[in-house]
Amino acid sequence: MNLSFASLWEKISDLIPEEDALICGDDVLSWREFDIRASKLASALIENGLSKNSKVAIYLNNSNEYLIAQYAIFKIDGCPINVNYRYVEDELTYLLENSDSEAVFFHSTYSNRIDNIKSSLPNIKLWVEVDDSSQKSSAIGVNYQNIIDNYQPMARIERDPNTIYML
């Protein structure tokens, strides 16, 4: 068995689909729900031109969406790039450029920072905005919930055990 995170979590999802996988406050997801949501995000990543070894920045606070995004990246054999929530525009631009990120997941609370740097990052193919309690929103990102509501789950794939999974 391939011991990549995605392959392992898919196997767990098959074995105990109704058991709790993620708990964040009152938001509880089963392994089946975790797998389906990540598969839908993975479909969106692929549709936007990402593939094996693509780097994807995660500019999210601790949340279920963070882990779902990370799982989606692992599903396409990509590499998640963690982004410190304290980073300001110059640091964000530097990290996103130098990590070769092709997509970014971000919470709405950071939308002003994202709005300020987007035009200087033409290699980013997909911006995914995750709503939070900040009541901020931007017009630059695809809404996370729209992806969950409208995409079909990605078919499972065989993964390369030598893929870079963390930078």
Please give the residue ranges for each predicted region.
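Conserved AMP-binding/adenylate-forming core of the ANL superfamily
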Residues: 2, 18-63, 67-71, 88-93, ...
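Aromatic/hydrophobic pocket-lining residues that form π-stacking "cages" and hydrophobic walls in ligand
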Residues: 9, 69, 114
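Acidic, amphipathic alpha-helical patches
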Residues: 9, 92, 144, 154-155
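Flexible acidic/glycine-rich loop/turn elements at helix↔coil and beta-strand↔loop transitions
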Residues: 12-17
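Structural core segment of the AMP-binding/adenylate-forming
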Residues: 47-48, 75-146
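Alpha-helix N-cap/helix-start capping motif
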Residues: 63-64, 108, 164
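Conserved pre-ATP/AMP-binding loop-to-beta segment of ANL
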Residues: 129, 149-167
